[in-house]
């Protein structure tokens, strides 16, 4: 009898423990669900090369702990790959221009640098790039300074030369040092194509301040073959941050050299605006790469882009830059309202001028985004 009572007590104790564990699990699930409700999801979208991944890295630097030494070191092979890819593009581009351009002679690499060029082009063709040694860096620097390569670089928009080219070419000796550890700035310039989805959680005014919202930002692969993978993220998103590289009005796609990048951006923005799951979603449009745009607009007419063919310059210098920017901004605003159902025109839509590499500007922009979304939440709660 005593044995039976003891056994029953053990069973009862086990049941009580299981019940307590189950209750604790349910409590934690409930708490996590409540916590999730206070986290606003932001979807960072844009065509390839729009600068959105640089903005994503800026958020990590600005509103999180940044990159630790291990993370910085993980970018070393990426940066070295960017260097080899860039010099190959410039070398091969100069050969192509030397064969096909009317003014072909200025694209002919000097005899003393031809062997170096062929060697570096071969390295750039490999899947596994070597470590950037001091010797290789000197050879790359020699080729970079060749007049033909500089002429080719001036036409980089036609050759898919990445925006990081000049920065890395001017820092070759530092990048090839045996003890080199990438800096935060190096990481911002590093170009690695986003595939799939990466996310980060942050608050523009700090996690410990009650007035600030907590956001979960998703960066999604921008190239065409990645877009259909976005669909599972669409539902419940508070806002879409759409990046448009306004400097790329005269460039073609990495994936399709017959397609203008600005035309692709226009079509993508229009497609996203019309998605049913975004009917109540706020839209934050980042007109990005303004730093490049303001230099290019003085050399390359805006109306070379089919979408901007009706643009007429009215001035020169700074006035022309502002006039061109306002024209582009108006085009996107018109597209937004044309692609938005009449009953949805009251959803939040803001346009920001951005330069992804400008940390102060990105910090200011995200605080403005935070303010807009908090005001919307207060309005929907009937508090405004």
From Swiss-Prot:
Molecular function terms, GO-annotated = G protein-coupled receptor binding; G-protein beta/gamma-subunit complex binding; GTP binding; GTPase activity; metal ion binding
One Pfam assignment: G-alpha
**PROSITE patterns reported in the protein's UniProt record:** G_ALPHA (PS51882)
Record's CDD domains?
G-alpha
Q: Which range is the signal sequence, renumbered to this chain? A: none
| Top-level taxon | Eukaryota
Sites of N-myristoyl glycine lipid attachment are: 2
Q: Which GO terms describe its cellular component?
A: cytoplasm; heterotrimeric G-protein complex
Q: G2 motif: where is this region?
A: 186-194
Q: Where does Mg(2+) bind?
A: 53, 194
Covalently lipidated residues, kind S-palmitoyl cysteine: 5
Q: Where is this region: G3 motif?
A: 215-224
Give the GO biological process terms.
adenylate cyclase-modulating G protein-coupled receptor signaling pathway
List the residue ranges of the region (G4 motif): 284-291
Q: Which cofactor does it need?
A: Mg(2+)
Q: Which keywords are on file for this protein?
A: GTP-binding, Hydrolase, Lipoprotein, Magnesium, Metal-binding, Myristate, Nucleotide-binding, Palmitate, Transducer
Q: Where is the G-alpha domain?
A: 38-384
Q: Region (G5 motif): which ranges?
A: 354-359
Q: Which residues bind GTP?
A: 49-54, 188-189, 194, 222, 288-289, 291, 356
Q: What is known of its domains?
A: The helical domain (69-189) is required for self-activation.
Role of this protein: Guanine nucleotide-binding proteins (G proteins) are involved as modulators or transducers in various transmembrane signaling systems.
Q: Which family does it belong to?
A: Belongs to the G-alpha family.
Name of the protein this chain belongs to = Guanine nucleotide-binding protein alpha-1 subunit
């Amino acid at each position: 009898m005593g044995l039976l009572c003891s056994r029953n007590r053990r069973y009862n104790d086990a049941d009580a423990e299981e019940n307590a564990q189950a209750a604790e699990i349910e409590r934690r699930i409930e708490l996590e669900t409540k916590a999730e409700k206070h986290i606003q999801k932001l979807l960072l979208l844009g065509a390839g090369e729009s600068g959105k991944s640089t903005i994503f890295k800026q958020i990590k630097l600005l509103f999180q702990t940044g990159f630790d030494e291990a993370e910085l070191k993980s970018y070393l092979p990426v940066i070295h790959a960017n260097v080899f890819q860039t010099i190959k593009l410039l070398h091969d581009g100069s050969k192509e221009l030397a064969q096909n351009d009317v003014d072909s002679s200025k694209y002919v690499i000097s005899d003393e640098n031809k062997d170096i060029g062929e060697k570096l082009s071969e390295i750039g063709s490999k899947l596994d790039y070597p470590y950037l040694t001091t010797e290789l860096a000197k050879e790359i620097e020699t080729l970079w300074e060749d007049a033909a390569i500089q002429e080719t670089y001036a036409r980089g928009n036609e050759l898919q030369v990445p925006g990081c080219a000049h920065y890395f070419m001017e820092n070759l000796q530092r990048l090839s040092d045996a003890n080199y550890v990438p800096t935060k700035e190096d990481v911002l310039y590093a170009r690695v194509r986003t595939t799939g989805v990466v996310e980060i959680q942050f608050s523009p005014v700090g996690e410990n301040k009650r007035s600030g919202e907590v956001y979960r930002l998703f960066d999604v692969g921008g190239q065409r073959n990645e877009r259909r993978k976005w669909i599972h993220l669409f539902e419940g998103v508070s806002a879409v941050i759409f990046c448009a590289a306004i400097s790329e009005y005269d460039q073609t796609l990495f994936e399709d050299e017959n397609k203008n990048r600005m035309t692709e951006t226009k079509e993508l923005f229009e497609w996203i605006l019309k998605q049913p799951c975004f009917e109540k979603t706020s839209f934050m449009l980042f007109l990005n790469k303004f730093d490049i745009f303001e230099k290019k607009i003085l050399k390359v007419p805006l109306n070379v882009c089919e979408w901007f063919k009706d643009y007429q310059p009215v001035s020169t210098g700074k006035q022309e830059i502002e006039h061109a920017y306002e024209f582009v901004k108006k085009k996107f605003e018109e597209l937004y309202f044309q692609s938005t159902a009449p009953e949805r025109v009251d959803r939040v839509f803001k346009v920001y001028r951005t330069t992804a590499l400008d940390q102060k500007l990105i910090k200011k922009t995200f605080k403005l985004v935070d303010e807009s979304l908090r005001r919307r939440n207060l309005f929907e709660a009937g508090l405004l």
